[in-house]
């Protein structure tokens, strides 16, 4: 394993020699080969789906169809045309001694990405790594074994064409990743995408820095001044459009003075999706005779990521109580306020600590593609290095370039 990782690290210099046009060409070729061979990917995915016996969120994440593969290819093409971050000077100045000092963007180095389900990440991450000149080792989940292998075989075909095959590797066995975790002298950072248990296990077994994507316990607060029709559209989109994703809504907080009116609007729409309601005792009565499945909230309710047609609901007396609740229970992912009160919006966005804070918009926009990044390595809930959807610039670091004319320090 050490020899393999050392070889990848050594060969990563090839990525630094690529021009922006080279990277564009490679990523466009990758999109082309995936589009041309989508049937091979679908056949592999059928095997994984047949072997996967669980239902719910992970099954949806595992599934690939022609539409999702074509969307993946379009995303890769967007990544190809994004400005190359490597070598970019973000700022420069001269110091008192006349030294020219510039801050230059560079790759992080050798990145390990560990992910569950979501086999499309095998291609998306490869494109992001090529664009950012990072070497990478991949470890997909066993539930997506056949699909990951099919996609990475196509990725590797493109890499070989450009003599970059030694800059990347995919691992499929659990014991292999446990070995990798020991090489803190070779791996620069680990980006885990998966369950809280998986992320914690990795953190407990390595000294390598982690950029975590924690669970997506996303909140919405409907304020007293909210336009209720707009609020209804936002809540339905955030909760019901795609429940298996980390940017879906899990907890709804409603100002107590509009609770009756707003919940009466929600109920008929939630019936269409058979949304299960986990209500705080102060909200229970408003769902009486709704014909929805209603559960009284317990001590774990507001710390639960449902990833299902289920929603935690609580009434609050004001914006301050909503902020307090969110800061107590949030996973630091995405939160939104629906309000026409500029003061409350400003307070909400200033005082909540999560990585993405919306006003009058759905949390479903927390996504690299939606942010204009082309794709994402993950959505970081960490506070160090990167936060929110991680595009190309977020898998870069920097160095200082200093030029002088013989200066010495007195």
From Swiss-Prot:
One of its GO terms (molecular function) is NADP binding. InterPro entries: Ald_DH/histidinol_DH (IPR016161), Ald_DH_C (IPR016163), Ald_DH_N (IPR016162), Aldehyde_DH_dom (IPR015590), G-glutamylP_reductase_CS (IPR020593), Glu-5-SA_DH (IPR012134), GPR_dom (IPR000965). Its main location: cytoplasm. Pathway: Amino-acid biosynthesis; L-proline biosynthesis; L-glutamate 5-semialdehyde from L-glutamate: step 2/2. It is found in: Cytoplasm. Keywords: Amino-acid biosynthesis, Cytoplasm, NADP, Oxidoreductase, Proline biosynthesis. Gene3D superfamilies: Aldehyde Dehydrogenase, Chain A, domain 1, Aldehyde Dehydrogenase, Chain A, domain 2. Signal peptide: none annotated. Its EC number is 1.2.1.41. It catalyses: L-glutamate 5-semialdehyde + phosphate + NADP(+) = L-glutamyl 5-phosphate + NADPH + H(+). GO terms for cellular component: cytoplasm. It comes from the Bacteria. GO terms for biological process: L-proline biosynthetic process. This is Gamma-glutamyl phosphate reductase. It comes from Campylobacter jejuni subsp. jejuni serotype O:23/36 (strain 81-176).
């Amino acid at each position: 394993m050490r020899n393999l990782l050392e070889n990848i690290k050594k060969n990563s210099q090839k990525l630094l020699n690529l021009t922006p046009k080279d990277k564009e060409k490679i990523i466009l070729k990758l999109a082309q080969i995936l589009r041309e061979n989508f049937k091979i990917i679908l056949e592999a995915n059928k095997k994984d789906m047949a072997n996967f016996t669980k239902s719910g969120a992970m099954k949806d994440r595992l599934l690939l169809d022609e539409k999702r593969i074509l969307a993946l290819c379009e995303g890769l093409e967007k990544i190809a045309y994004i400005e190359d971050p490597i070598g970019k000077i973000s700022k420069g100045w001269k110091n008192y001694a006349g030294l020219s000092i510039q801050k230059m963007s560079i790759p992080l180095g050798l990145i390990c990405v560990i992910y569950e389900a979501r086999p499309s990440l095998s291609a998306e991450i490869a494109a992001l790594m090529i664009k950012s000149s990072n070497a990478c080792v991949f470890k997909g989940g066993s539930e997506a074994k056949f699909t990951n292998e099919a996609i990475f075989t196509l990725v590797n075909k493109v890499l070989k064409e450009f003599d970059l095959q030694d800059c990347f590797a995919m691992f499929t066995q659990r014991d292999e990743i446990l070995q990798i975790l020991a090489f803190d002298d070779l791996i620069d950072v680990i980006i885990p995408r998966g369950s809280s248990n998986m992320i914690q296990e990795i953190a407990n077994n390595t000294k390598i820095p982690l950029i975590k994507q924690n669970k997506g316990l996303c909140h919405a607060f409907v304020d007293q001044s909210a336009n209720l029709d707009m609020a209804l559209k936002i809540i339905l989109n955030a909760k019901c459009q795609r429940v298996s994703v980390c940017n879906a809504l899990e907890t709804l907080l409603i100002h107590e003075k509009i609770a009756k009116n707003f919940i009466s609007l929600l109920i008929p729409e939630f019936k269409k999706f058979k949304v299960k309601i986990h209500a705080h005792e102060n909200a229970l009565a408003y769902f009486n005779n709704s014909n929805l499945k209603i559960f009284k909230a317990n001590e774990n309710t507001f710390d639960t990521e449902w990833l299902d047609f289920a929603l935690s609901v609580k009434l609050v007396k004001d914006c301050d109580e909503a902020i307090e609740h969110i800061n107590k229970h949030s996973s630091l992912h995405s939160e939104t306020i629906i309000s026409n009160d500029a003061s409350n919006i400003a307070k909400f966005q200033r005082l909540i600590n999560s990585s993405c804070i919306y006003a009058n918009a759905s949390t479903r926009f927390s996504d690299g593609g939606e942010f204009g990044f082309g794709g994402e390595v993950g959505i970081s809930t960490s506070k160090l290095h990167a936060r929110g959807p991680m595009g190309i610039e977020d898998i870069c670091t920097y160095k200082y370039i200093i030029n002088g004319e013989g200066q010495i320090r007195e």
